[in-house]
Amino acid sequence: MSYRIDFEGSSEIGAYMSLTNTYCVIGRSQSNNVLKFLQENVAIPIVETTINSIRSVGSQCRGNRHGLLVPHTITDQEIMHIRNSLPEDVVVRRIEERLNALGNVILCNDHIAIIHGDLDKESEDLIRDVLQVHVYRQNIGQEPLVGTFGALNNQGMLVHPFTSTECQKELSELLEVNVVAGTINGGSQCVGGGVVANDWMCIAGIKTTNVEMAVIEGVFDLTGDQDLEARRRAIVDAIVR
């Protein structure tokens, strides 16, 4: 299942949203259009919030089915709201990190994470413990902002178009997923800013072309509605139990 939307006129969906197999975090908006769309199409808990009064929560946080990492700039009220809105077994943790746009410097699925090389060792340890993943300091090509220039689920990884074949192969072997280079929103290199995905759906910016969407659906293994519905039910049922 794949969709193309905008967030109050912006196609940078990844900047305003974080989507995992167990929850979705979305920036607070003036209209209810995006929230209503998510409530109708995403069968997991949704939390609408700000982080440090900023709506671009996708750039500020990073998580998976096990946990959610938020920057130290988040207010007590905001983190309490997030904790109360997510499943009880999802650990929400602040990180005291200089590079506090966590969504831009961390990229993960439910098993592995790659991070900006300049993150603190303490941050690396928290990422490993909270998200329950193996952690590697790894660029995407020449780009250290892995969350900006890559998008990842448990089946595949989309990377920016100037990622060499050698780097794609290296990432594929490291992450044990298929890795494909592509663009988003009609040619943008910032693929992480333009699409979010879990294991049964993806949401891309409204400017994304049909060709770009076909590449995205292929790398994330999101073709075949019946198979995706069965996958969604299996994952959601496991969460409920």
UniProtKB/Swiss-Prot annotation:
GO biological process, one term: ribosomal large subunit biogenesis
UniProt main location, coarse: cytoplasm
Keywords per UniProt: Cytoplasm, Initiation factor, Nucleus, Protein biosynthesis, Ribosome biogenesis
GO molecular function, one term: ribosomal large subunit binding
Pfam families: eIF-6
Compartmental location: Cytoplasm; Nucleus, Nucleolus
SUPFAM superfamilies linked: Pentein
GO CC annotation terms, alphabetical: cytoplasm; nucleolus
Family classification: Belongs to the eIF-6 family.
Task performed by this protein: Binds to the 60S ribosomal subunit and prevents its association with the 40S ribosomal subunit to form the 80S initiation complex in the cytoplasm. Is also involved in ribosome biogenesis. Associates with pre-60S subunits in the nucleus and is involved in its nuclear export.
NCBIfam families per UniProt: eIF-6
Subunit structure: Monomer. Associates with the 60S ribosomal subunit.
UniProt cross-references to HAMAP family, sorted A to Z: eIF_6 (MF_00032)
Protein name according to UniProt: Eukaryotic translation initiation factor 6
Taxonomic source organism: Encephalitozoon cuniculi (strain GB-M1)
Lineage, top ranks: Eukaryota, Fungi, Fungi incertae sedis, Microsporidia, Unikaryonidae
